[in-house]
Amino acid sequence: MTMADVAGKLIDGFVKAFYIAKKDAKVYYFKAPNFTYGFLMPVSLFLAFSIAGQINSALIVSGLTSLVILFATTSIEAVAVVLEKQTGTFERLLVAPVSFFTILFGKALAGLFFGLVLAIAILVPLAVFSGTTIANPVLVLFAIAFSALAFSALGALVSAYAKWVPEAQMLSNFLRFPMAFLSGTFVPLELMPAQLGIIARLLPLTYSVEALRISINDSAPITTYLLDILVLALFSFALLVIAAKVLQRKIE
């Protein structure tokens, strides 16, 4: 197989994934209730910690933006495949010459676009009201995009494993809430006990918060930011590969 053949297959797969993403965006994501839920839980958590005086104002912009991306993308992604398996529409995708990985990548792309829109919708007013100057908007957009892709891939894994919507919702909450408290969203990693700091480095939300904080505040070298983006990309790929294998095993 030549390089041209490989490139052709990659482009063909991406085109198929794009159309799957376009369909999912219309059917699942861009509806008013989804926007509301994407904001509601993260904002509630931050308000609770802010009232208690346990949150540093410098963490609000990056931490809340990351949480909005996490809750918004996983809330829909975690049930999308489950719903399609129950209604029989997922089998229609399998009739086409498309791999399980491509299907899930397309669904994750829809989550990426939705997370990008929601993150910008919360980031801009947060920056204005807090008086925060965004140091590098381009790096912020890349951080949001890779964060949304990683969290969508996590949701895809949950959706591939679950049989029913309540099971998918329970599993996604089981993953989201520990991440929300252990990833430096409310308390900087430097102030955490060493054991919790090690656990935090195993969670994708940690790298999302750190990448956003660096790109917003210019608080660390660019190499740290690039490492965060690389880790988010690796999380995305690994989670999608695992999700594709889980889904294939459960269906076949």
Model region roles, listed by residue range:
Residues 19, 23-27, 91-95, 163, ...:
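Short amphipathic alpha-helical coupling elements at transmembrane boundaries
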Residues 6-9, 13-16, 20-87, 115, ...:
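Transmembrane helix-boundary elements of multi-pass transport/secretion proteins
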Residues 206-220:
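Short, membrane-exposed interhelical loops at transmembrane-helix boundaries
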Residues 46-50, 123, 127, 156, ...:
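Transmembrane alpha-helix boundary and packing residues in multipass membrane permease domains
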Residues 44, 58-126, 155, 174, ...:
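Hydrophobic alpha-helical transmembrane segments of multi-pass membrane transport proteins
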Residues 49-53, 159-202, 206:
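Transmembrane helix segments
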Residues 100-172, 222-233, 237-243:
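Alpha-helical transmembrane segments and their short interhelical loops
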